[in-house]
Amino acid sequence: DGLMLRMSEAQWDAVINVNLKSAFNFIHACAPIMLRQRGGSIINMSSVVGVHGNAGQCNYSASKAGMIGLAKSIAQELGPKGVRANAVAPGFIETPMTAQLSEDIRKDWMKKIPLRRGGQTNDIANVCLFLASDMSSYVSGQVIQVDGGMNM
């Protein structure tokens, strides 16, 4: 993370490579199998900052926005062969990383969330389970924000 004007190209590349290029490589390897079986579900893990941006996180935001564009493009390319692609965009999720935030910062975040709580990792997992299942057989090219209503 860092301000764009202070970010080196190496810092930019590191985040883009981990978050976006690795997803492309994984999908590129798996898609032929899904095409042969005429079905499958690709789920890209994005973020609400991929939808809305965030000052000080231009590389992360761009990589997560790229995950959305990748899912939408793949949904169009592979959909005719029965392969679905979607993106999940988590908001504030209770993790060891967010547990390190100060109480004041946490309170500020909770004020922005209508449900007045952070999400749990199983909230994300349940959305992914839905997208991977036949219950979502007509859902493709979508971004599902799992954020307690923070970004309506």
Predicted regions span which residues?
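Substrate-binding pocket helix/loop in short-chain dehydrogenase/reductase
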Residues: 2-4, 8-16, 98, 109
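Active-site loop immediately N-terminal to the catalytic Tyr-X3-Lys motif
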Residues: 3-5, 52-58, 80-81, 116, ...
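Active-site loop-to-helix junction immediately N-terminal to the catalytic Tyr of the SDR YXXXK motif
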Residues: 7, 53-61, 73, 101
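Active-site helix of classical SDR
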Residues: 27, 63, 71
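Alpha-helical segment proximal to the catalytic Tyr-Lys
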Residues: 32, 76-80, 137
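Residue(s) in the substrate-gating loop at a strand-loop-helix junction
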Residues: 47
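C-terminal helical subdomain
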Residues: 87, 110-135, 139, 148
